[in-house]
Amino acid sequence: NMGLGPDSNDKKIVQNCIEDITLISGQKAVITKFKKSISNFKTRKGATAGIKVTLRNNKMYEFIDRLVNIALPRIKDFEGLSIKGFDNFGNYSFGIKEHIVFPEINFDKVDRIRGMDITLVTNNRNKKATFALLEALNFPFIKKDNKKEMN
């Protein structure tokens, strides 16, 4: 998921972001729209909110492999992923501040460095099982006392 903020009105920027997410994921991204207008956030119902892609099966595993082995190590001052991103339903969410850490992105064509949110939805129904699964997939978590914080 990539939120566009004030750039959501510029069709060229939206198209560039769709191309970037498509390159990163290997699957066509879709535009997300606001469901209702909120004046405090200056949003209008039906306006572009961002871009998302949902990966399953082989494409998901290929993405996780590139994320863990290539993209995350390229993040400047990266110490590991926080374990605070787990919810009570066995899902894990985290953000990346720069989408250019993925090798598929041509740095010369990027108009602006953007962040993205990544959510991993699992069939596990608790934090511990999901944590064990992601550790088995070599996700680099911060090495504080993880076992205490998972309870």
Give each language-model segment a name.
Residues 1-151:
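Ribosome-associated RNA-binding proteins
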